[in-house]
Amino acid sequence: MKFIIKLFPEIMIKSESVRKRFVKILTGNIRNVLNKYDDTVAVVKHWDYIEVRSKNIENRTLLVELLGRIPGIHHFLEVEEKPFVTLHDIFEQTLSDVATQIENKTFCVRVKRKGKHDFSSLDAERYIGGGLNQAVASAKVQLSKPDVTVRIDIENDKMMLIKARHQGIGGYPIGTQEDVLSLISGGFDSGVSSYMLIRRGSRVHYCFFNLGGATHEIGVKQMAYHIWKRFSGSHKVRFVAINFEQVVAEILEKVDNGQMGVVLKRMMVRAASKVAQRFGIQAIVTGEALGQVSSQTLTNLRLIDEVAESLVLRPLITHDKEQIIAKAKEIGTEDIAKSMPEFCGAISKSPTVKAVKEKIEQEESYFDFSVLESAVQNAQYLDIRQIAEQTKKEVSEVDEITVLSANEVILDIRSPEEVDDKPLEISGQNIILMPFYKLSSHFAELDQSKNYVLYCERGVMSKLQALYLREKGFDNVKVLNKIS
């Protein structure tokens, strides 16, 4: 099984030294991601493409899914490589592969060629296309918008019949740009802004300001872990949790109501700047969009940035909410975001849209900054890969079982792609498919007289979701530790 990885076009127009560095980094990223699932994978870089080979045909669907999420890949081709001697050899091998595909359909042949041959690409297209047209009586050549396009790459003495073309997410390989720290709240905006910086080649770390207790933290961890695992699993990243409840209490007690929103954001930026400095991170990322809420006017954003000791990036600054939600749906964070309450907007009833610097500074003079310093000093730093281990401790009150009884219902909370790749089949057992990101909105609709056993491949999401549901008041949940 072989894939040809085509690079993001912006990589190809870089200088030779930069392009080589980007391709080297992308090759390493692909290897890091795929080797976790298939130890037979070989990744080889070439001048303008990367070659991926695997001996495990059964992993095809999984590898296609994984490659489609790695930043830096524009698209990739699933190919079958064969040797040839003459142009007629190419025709015969193509015929055996595509004859059934072009029956009763229109088709055309497209050839790309490298190396020295006694025929041109156009000669090959005409010869192979004419042969297919004669050999398959019900097929008809049509050069414009055919039903089937037969694509063949010829390089020296080998032909590659392109079986399928898959789209990548584009962008730059992770590690080609500096690290950033994303202020993630669990909502639509912060998840999408994190993804956009990942796609642009930055390793994204996460900073979470806890305003809503354990339930809030669990939901945000779910989102951060999902984004990391899906799009940036090639790299280690940090998850930083800062308890901001006392900071909010101080603001509510001492700051004028209309100024609270801007003051809170300034406190968050101050804290995030300290975290960024500690780890040598170059920039802070937020999900703010111009005019979306009262604190996101140009005047207020300028005042917020004044206290930043790091560059503040706002990739969504010109995006509409509709665009942001559509992107959240595309990357798989929409349902998590839907279940997340908006804490920041709840602390001020009459927020100012045009804050005055002197007024903000006057209000902040009443604030006890030792509360902010204490919150930063007591921040929790976690390797995002350790979320599973930490969750084990946090969900100790949730039963983990290895043997199922007849009256227990399994909730398979894996994504639809994972379920398709490895269906869970247990004889005599009732299994309900409900992706983890739909639990918060759909679990209450289930028959609550039954006990539900949550299952996922590695146990991370099932434990997080079990704790989340317990926090919501559902006691009828357990975790499937191992299939028996």
From Swiss-Prot:
GO molecular function, one term: tRNA binding
Ligand binding (ATP): L183, I184, K265, G287, Q296
GO annotations of cellular component type: cytosol
Catalytic activity, as annotated: [ThiI sulfur-carrier protein]-S-sulfanyl-L-cysteine + a uridine in tRNA + 2 reduced [2Fe-2S]-[ferredoxin] + ATP + H(+) = [ThiI sulfur-carrier protein]-L-cysteine + a 4-thiouridine in tRNA + 2 oxidized [2Fe-2S]-[ferredoxin] + AMP + diphosphate; [ThiS sulfur-carrier protein]-C-terminal Gly-Gly-AMP + S-sulfanyl-L-cysteinyl-[cysteine desulfurase] + AH2 = [ThiS sulfur-carrier protein]-C-terminal-Gly-aminoethanethioate + L-cysteinyl-[cysteine desulfurase] + A + AMP + 2 H(+)
Subcellular location: Cytoplasm
GO terms, biological process: thiamine biosynthetic process; thiamine diphosphate biosynthetic process; thiazole biosynthetic process; tRNA 4-thiouridine biosynthesis
Chain segments annotated as coiled-coil in the UniProt record: none
Keyword terms: ATP-binding, Cytoplasm, Disulfide bond, Nucleotide-binding, Redox-active center, RNA-binding, Thiamine biosynthesis, Transferase, tRNA-binding
Enzyme class: transferase
UniProt domain Rhodanese: residue ranges: 404-484
Entries under PROSITE patterns matching the protein: RHODANESE_3, THUMP
InterPro entries linked: Rhodanese-like_dom, Rhodanese-like_dom_sf, Rossmann-like_a/b/a_fold, ThiI_AANH, ThiI_fer, ThiI_N, THII_Thiazole_biosynth_dom, THUMP_dom
CDD domains in the cross-refs: PPase_ThiI (cd01712), RHOD (cd00158), THUMP_ThiI (cd11716)
Main location: cytoplasm
SUPFAM superfamilies tied to this protein: Adenine nucleotide alpha hydrolases-like, Rhodanese/Cell cycle control phosphatase, THUMP domain-like
Active site (catalytic residues): C456
Disulfide bonds: C344-C456
Pathway assignment: Cofactor biosynthesis; thiamine diphosphate biosynthesis
EC number assigned by the record: 2.8.1.4
Record has Lipid biosynthesis as a keyword: no
Domain THUMP residue range list: 61-165
Function: Catalyzes the ATP-dependent transfer of a sulfur to tRNA to produce 4-thiouridine in position 8 of tRNAs, which functions as a near-UV photosensor. Also catalyzes the transfer of sulfur to the sulfur carrier protein ThiS, forming ThiS-thiocarboxylate. This is a step in the synthesis of thiazole, in the thiamine biosynthesis pathway. The sulfur is donated as persulfide by IscS.
Family: Belongs to the ThiI family.
Protein name: tRNA sulfurtransferase
Species name: Histophilus somni (strain 2336)
